Amino acid sequence: MPRGLELLIAQTILQGFDAQYGRFLEVTSGAQQRFEQADWHAVQLAMKNRIHLYDHHVGLVVEQLRCITNGQSTDAAFLLRVKEHYTRLLPDYPRFEIAESFFNSVYCRLFDHRSLTPERLFIFSSQPERSFRTIPRPLAKDFHPDHGWESLLMRVISDLPLRLRWQNKSRDIHYIIRHLTETLGTDNLAESHLQVANELFYRNKAAWLVGKLITPSGTLPFLLPIHQTDDGELFIDTCLTTTAEASIVFGFARSYFMVYAPLPAALVEWLREILPGKTTAELYMAIGCQKHAKTESYREYLVYLQGCNEQFIEAPGIRGMVMLVFTLPGFDRVFKVIKDKFAPQKEMSAAHVRACYQLVKEHDRVGRMADTQEFENFVLEKRHISPALMELLLQEAAEKITDLGEQIVIRHLYIERRMVPLNIWLEQVEGQQLRDAIEEYGNAIRQLAAANIFPGDMLFKNFGVTRHGRVVFYDYDEICYMTEVNFRDIPPPRYPEDELASEPWYSVSPGDVFPEEFRHWLCADPRIGPLFEEMHADLFRADYWRALQNRIREGHVEDVYAYRRRQRFSVRYGEMLF
């Protein structure tokens, strides 16, 4: 290889990342127009396109590098020099942390995810102590109640870039003040002020104002979801001021926000104060930098592994027919490997399963489907694997495992947030907690269906409960679009003997679903059946599902709220006139 080629390759990779992030910002900057035009299908398409941008630009860079090197193979020493040159380009680079992840992605694509060592990749950051330099413009603006909170909030709302009319600005401001007074008290509120992010956070059919409520006793989140009426007028639906509420809004089961962030690291640091329970990976994920979030997630895993004295074990719950799931007892994530062979009733391929997981990655998850990170050639030290799990891995996924002596390499796996399986949760709770869980489960099914997702296998074991008590779907191998399903009523029996027969008296085609049958496995527990019949009996009717299908086919996009209905101003305070 000619001397100087290493620098050219390093510059080519960084220029490729510049192009990718430029397109990322370009797609993101269109969020305001899509919101104002109420073009919800364009919102969904932009979300999917933005996710695809990263891999597309990695592919472009890989092709450039193959042209530059004339397709010649490169030795380890050459690659190390490329990384050294790349590292030297980063100290003055504003998005160095994501540029490192982009380098990793290019390397993995070039070498088919082999030889993934710290010397060749940015397993850990090259600049861990780097502080954020002074940024050209502040991320947020402070508002003080010098003339009272009504005047303050009027200034906040008037500063917004949205060009639509407000339905009733005075009403919304009074709702917010009433909520803040109930939360803080009049005296504390008078001594508090706001710091509001300059950029709105767009997702689904809402534009979120994100800020900090700085009080005498500490800093709280200040979140305002802005929606549109059917007439295209703006209104504020609620005000959220607890870290638990903010955590759900920025949750791992939701689609990524579209927020214009030329300096994502600075935005992540700013958000950290109001989202103290979120890891760095989760914050990058929330603002759409999902590939760098994967890097940070892997780093968090390595740090935990180095500091613990645990072994991987099979994850608690009913063993899956498609996935082998394992975890570290104290770690908040699970590792999912597609089995070599599935149970007989699972008539599908591994490629189908991977396609289902990709569908979830790109679709609106409406707060009800867990996000995943996909890894290839994942290395595990044998000493970290319990004997029982090692035996299970070799029994169920031997074709995906390479034995390296002291280590094994798993060819492909997913990492996902760990939750308590819903079937286990239901066994452990009583009273109001049981009722809440059943209500949450039914709401999850409804919201998934409204987003054009049919879970397929609706058993409780395929859902998990988060630390905030939300029910989230996490088993995707039978997932499909609602519009692909044929929801049918069970025909009346022809003769009394039909109901006793081992085979149905009616024909069943692929894609047929009979909602009446859900009752058999969802209501079998006498503690659960009456609650389900009370709150979700319509889920057992085929006409309910067909009506949802019709709305989807007509192009209707349902509203998705990251908070309970009872928190909406219209429910809490009614239509008060001001």
Swiss-Prot record:
The keyword Protease does not apply. It catalyses: L-seryl-[isocitrate dehydrogenase] + ATP = O-phospho-L-seryl-[isocitrate dehydrogenase] + ADP + H(+). It comes from the Bacteria. Keywords: ATP-binding, Cytoplasm, Glyoxylate bypass, Hydrolase, Kinase, Nucleotide-binding, Protein phosphatase, Serine/threonine-protein kinase, Transferase, Tricarboxylic acid cycle. It is found in: Cytoplasm. Its main location: cytoplasm. The keyword Cytoplasm applies. ATP binds at residues 315-321, 336. One of its GO terms (biological process) is glyoxylate cycle. One of its GO terms (molecular function) is ATP binding. The active site is at residue 371. Disulfide bonds: none annotated. GO terms for cellular component: cytoplasm. Its EC number is 2.7.11.5, 3.1.3.-. Bifunctional enzyme which can phosphorylate or dephosphorylate isocitrate dehydrogenase (IDH) on a specific serine residue. This is a regulatory mechanism which enables bacteria to bypass the Krebs cycle via the glyoxylate shunt in response to the source of carbon. When bacteria are grown on glucose, IDH is fully active and unphosphorylated, but when grown on acetate or ethanol, the activity of IDH declines drastically concomitant with its phosphorylation. Belongs to the AceK family. This is Isocitrate dehydrogenase kinase/phosphatase. It comes from Shigella boydii serotype 18 (strain CDC 3083-94 / BS512). The lineage of its organism: Bacteria, Pseudomonadati, Pseudomonadota, Gammaproteobacteria, Enterobacterales. The gene is aceK.
